[in-house]
C-alpha cells in the first residue's frame, strides 16, 4: 500500500526507491505521484524565485580605485529533468536560505573578479554592459548547480575617495558648457524656427479662415436655399393639409347638418304628436272642465243678475215709496209752516210794533246766549271800580250798543221800535 502525493507548480516532488529498484528517482512538479509505504522516500524542493543582493566593498578596479558595488539578482532552480536532478543532488534537504547563500557567494566572487578587469568609467558609465558581463561569466557556474539567473542588475556604484564625484564634476562642467552652447544655439534656431512657424501658421490660418469663410458662405447660401425649399414644401403641405382638413370639416358639417335636419324633422314630428297629445289632454283636463265651470258660473251669474235686478227694483220701489211719503210729509209740514207763517204775518201786521217787540224779545235770549258763550268758561267776573257812577255808566254804554249789535246779527233795527227807542233814549 502507499499514498498519492500532489504538488503545486511552485514545488518539485522527488520520489526515490520503490518496487522498481533502489536507484529509481521520479521528479514531479505541478502534478501527483504514487509512493509506497516503507520502501519509497518523498522530498520537496522549492521552485520559487529567490532574490539575492550581492555586495562587493572596496574592490580595486583595473586602475586601482577602490569601489563598492551592489546589485540585485533573481535566480531559481531550473525545471529541466537533468538540471533539476543536479539541483536536487546538491540542495535537496536544504532550506531556501542555504541555497541563497551558496548562489550569493558565487555571484559575489564573479563580481569581484570582473571589477578587477574594468576601469571606473567602464563600470560607472556602462552598467548594463557590466551587469551583462557578470551574468555571462557567472551563469555557467551556477548552471552546473541547476540554478538559472533570471536577471542581474547593478544597483549602486560608489567610492570613499570622491573619485566618482570628481569625475562627475569635470564631466558636469563639460556637459554644462556644451549644454549652454546647445541651449543658445537651440534658442537661436528655435527663435528662427518659431518665427518661420508663426509665419507659416498665420499663412495657414489666413488661408484656413478664407476657406472657412467661403465654406460658411456657401453653407449659408445652401442652407438658405434648402430652408426656402423646405419652407415652400412645408407651406404647400400645410396648405394642402388645411384644404383637406377644410374639405373634411365641410363633409363632416354637411353630415352633421343632414343629421340635424333628420333629428329636427323627427323632433318636429314628435313635437307635433306631443302638441296633439297635449291639446287632447288640455281639452280633456282643462277645456271641458273650464267650459263646464264657465257654463255653471254663467248660470250662477245670470241667476245672481236676475236676483240683483229684482233686489234693485225692489229697493228702488222702496226708496221711491219712502221718498213719496217723505215728500208728502215735507209738503204737509211746509204747508203747515207756511200757514203758520201766514198767520204770524197776519198777526204781526195786525198787532204792529207789539208783535215785533215780542219777536225781538223772543230772539234776545238766543242772542245773549251766543254773545255770552265765551263767558261760560269764566268762573268769576270782578269789576274793579271805586265809584258807583262808573259802573252805571258802563251798563248804560252796553245797552246803548245793543241795538247796533242786534241789527248787525239779525238785520232788525231796534232803534225803529218805539219801546226800545224810548228805553235807550232815556238811558242816554
Curated annotation (Swiss-Prot):
Lipidation (N-myristoyl glycine): 2
Pfam families: Band_7, Flot
GO BP, one annotated term: regulation of myoblast differentiation
Lipidation (S-palmitoyl cysteine): 4, 19-20
GO CC entries: acrosomal membrane; adherens junction; basolateral plasma membrane; caveola; cell-cell contact zone; cortical actin cytoskeleton; cytoplasmic vesicle; dendrite cytoplasm
Tissue: Expressed in many tissues, including suprabasal epidermis, hair follicles, heart, lung, thymus, spleen, liver, kidney and brain. Not expressed in skeletal muscle.
Functional note: May act as a scaffolding protein within caveolar membranes, functionally participating in formation of caveolae or caveolae-like vesicles. May be involved in epidermal cell adhesion and epidermal structure and function.
Homology family: Belongs to the band 7/mec-2 family. Flotillin subfamily.
Listed name of the protein: Flotillin-2
Amino acid at each position: 500500500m502507499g499514498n498519492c502525493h500532489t504538488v503545486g507548480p511552485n514545488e518539485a516532488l522527488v520520489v526515490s526507491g520503490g518496487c522498481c529498484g533502489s536507484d529509481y528517482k521520479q521528479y514531479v512538479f505541478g502534478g501527483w505521484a504514487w509512493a509506497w509505504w516503507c520502501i519509497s522516500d518523498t522530498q520537496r524542493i522549492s521552485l520559487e524565485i529567490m532574490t539575492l543582493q550581492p555586495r562587493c566593498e572596496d574592490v580595486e578596479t583595473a586602475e586601482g580605485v577602490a569601489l563598492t558595488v551592489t546589485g540585485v539578482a533573481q535566480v531559481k532552480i531550473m525545471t529541466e529533468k537533468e538540471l533539476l536532478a543536479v539541483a536536487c543532488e546538491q540542495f535537496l534537504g536544504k532550506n531556501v536560505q542555504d541555497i541563497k547563500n551558496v548562489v550569493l557567494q558565487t555571484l559575489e566572487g564573479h563580481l569581484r573578479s570582473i571589477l578587477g578587469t574594468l576601469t571606473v568609467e567602464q563600470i560607472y558609465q556602462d552598467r548594463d554592459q557590466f551587469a551583462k558581463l557578470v551574468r555571462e561569466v557567472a551563469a555557467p557556474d551556477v548552471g552546473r548547480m541547476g540554478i538559472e539567473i533570471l536577471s542581474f542588475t547593478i544597483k549602486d556604484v560608489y567610492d570613499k575617495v570622491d573619485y566618482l564625484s570628481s569625475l562627475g564634476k569635470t564631466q558636469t562642467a563639460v556637459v554644462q558648457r556644451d549644454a549652454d552652447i546647445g541651449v543658445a544655439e537651440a534658442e537661436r534656431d528655435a527663435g528662427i524656427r518659431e518665427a518661420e512657424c508663426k509665419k507659416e501658421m498665420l499663412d495657414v490660418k489666413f488661408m484656413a479662415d478664407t476657406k472657412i469663410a467661403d465654406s460658411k458662405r456657401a453653407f449659408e447660401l445652401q442652407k438658405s436655399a434648402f430652408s426656402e425649399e423646405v419652407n415652400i414644401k412645408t407651406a404647400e403641405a400645410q396648405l394642402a393639409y388645411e384644404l383637406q382638413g377644410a374639405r373634411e370639416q365641410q363633409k363632416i358639417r354637411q353630415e352633421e347638418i343632414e343629421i340635424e335636419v333628420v333629428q329636427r324633422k323627427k323632433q318636429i314630428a314628435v313635437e307635433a304628436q306631443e302638441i296633439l297629445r297635449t291639446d287632447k289632454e288640455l281639452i280633456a283636463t282643462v277645456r271641458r272642465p273650464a267650459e263646464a265651470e264657465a257654463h255653471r258660473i254663467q248660470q250662477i251669474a245670470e241667476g245672481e243678475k236676475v236676483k240683483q235686478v229684482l233686489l234693485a227694483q225692489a229697493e228702488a220701489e222702496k226708496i221711491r215709496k219712502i221718498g213719496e211719503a217723505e215728500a208728502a210729509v215735507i209738503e204737509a209740514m211746509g204747508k203747515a209752516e207756511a200757514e203758520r207763517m201766514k198767520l204770524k204775518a197776519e198777526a204781526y201786521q195786525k198787532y204792529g210794533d207789539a208783535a215785533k217787540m215780542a219777536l225781538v224779545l223772543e230772539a234776545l235770549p238766543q242772542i245773549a246766549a251766543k254773545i255770552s258763550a265765551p263767558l261760560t268758561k269764566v268762573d268769576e267776573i270782578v269789576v274793579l271800580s271805586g265809584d258807583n257812577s262808573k259802573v252805571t255808566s258802563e251798563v248804560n254804554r252796553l245797552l246803548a250798543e245793543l241795538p247796533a249789535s242786534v241789527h248787525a246779527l239779525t238785520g232788525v233795527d231796534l232803534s225803529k221800535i218805539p219801546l226800545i227807542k224810548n228805553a235807550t233814549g232815556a238811558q242816554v
